Amino acid sequence: DARIEHVKKQITPFPSFASALKALGIDYGNLIESDLRKKGCGPKDNPWGHFEKLLNKEIKVDSAVYNSSLPTYRISWEGQTSNVRERLITLSRFELESDVIEHFIDDVESDILSNPYLISEWCARNFIEKVSTRTIDLGAFPDPTIQGDNVPVPPFAAESILDTRRLRSLVVERLYSVLTDGDTLVSIKEMEDYLRDIMTEEDKARLLRLCS
């Protein structure tokens, strides 16, 4: 479908870049991202490299309201461990609010670098409905029409809708969904039927895209 392809071309591979900056305590994240776009950061580029250039004065934005804060931002960024920086970059691949990103910056025991579906599991347990397994799919499945040259790679990437990490996330979502509805027990058969229905639905959607 041409409309789907058009939408994909407009999607950045790092949709929560500005939210990640906010989680780090950096103000004006949306403005910084907008200025970086104007200074050569394309829609499929990784904005984090451009952000470092801004901090190092390799990119200059005249009269920007945040210019006086850039030295402080640089200290904050360079003061983070490589693990925290990598987690921030990873988290920015998904459509997340800054409070969710902040949680996973602090929760260094959560191995989101190997299993990004831990994010949707945690959100399900905390009834954060804006983030689902499918939210993570968009950043975990390699798709050059969305991510350009920044496609995810193993062990982070998901290669199949049957990825066990993904299936576990779907199961956790279902369990907490029925809990909200007042049910406390779900049979194995009910869960199998639920997963089978999802897989069938996704297979049909994929076939329609291939035929359109």
Indicate residue ranges for each PLM-predicted region.
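Helicase P-loop NTPase motor core of nucleic-acid translocases
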Residues: 1-212
